[in-house]
Design a protein with these regions (language model features):
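Short, low-complexity, Pro/Ser/Thr/Gly-rich segments in the mature regions of secreted, periplasmic
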Residues: 145-156
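Conserved polar/disulfide-associated segments of primarily extracytoplasmic proteins
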Residues: 46-145
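Sec/Tat signal peptide C-region and signal peptidase I cleavage site
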Residues: 17-21
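N-terminal "mature-domain start" segment
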Residues: 22-51, 153-154
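Positively charged n-region of N-terminal signal peptides that target proteins for export
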Residues: 1-4
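Bacterial N-terminal signal peptides
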Residues: 7-16
Length: 157
């Protein structure tokens, strides 16, 4: 029941947060990464990379959503991932929020002038599943209510 309830809440929040936005659930064939988001907002589905690791969607107002997976070849943990990202000295990249749990990590901040939100799940199957959302500050009021539900919908097998 604990695993089912957050998914149900996430789906309900997506619908409630944008009454006109139809939810779409994407499942990555290679890694089994699953995320649900409003397809009425993220309308431009980009071509899948040749390696099949995920998918990207763009919105008309400059937002981007990526749902993907990677093999955890370095045996990263949520804490090591956050520590590494916080230590990064990349220009235009600032983390303003981070949190970790037993098998997940969340980062938020600004990158290249956009607000970003990233959630990663560290699977027992050796796969890190990620949802990344970024958007211009000018549309913050539109996307802030959606981010939590979209990130909360991230799951894997």
């Amino acid at each position: 029941m604990k695993r089912f309830f957050p998914g149900l809440v996430s789906a309900a929040l997506i619908v409630a947060s944008s009454a006109t936005a139809a939810p779409f659930t994407y499942t990555n064939a290679r890694f089994g990464t699953v995320c649900t988001f409003p397809v009425d907002i993220f309308t431009d589905r980009r071509p899948e990379p040749d390696n099949g690791d995920g998918q990207q969607w763009l919105s008309a107002d400059g937002a981007s959503l990526i749902c993907s997976g990677i093999n955890n070849v370095n045996d990263d943990t949520p804490k090591s991932f956050v520590a590494e990202e916080k230590a990064a000295k990349e220009a235009g990249y600032e983390i303003t929020y981070s949190k970790t749990g037993k098998n997940w990590a969340v980062l938020s901040g600004q990158k290249d002038g956009k607000i970003f939100y990233e959630r990663r799940l560290f699977g027992k199957d050796g796969v890190i599943r990620t949802v990344w959302i970024d958007y211009p500050p000018a549309v913050k009021a539109k996307y802030d209510p959606l981010v939590g539900a979209i990130a909360g919908s991230l799951k894997g097998p």
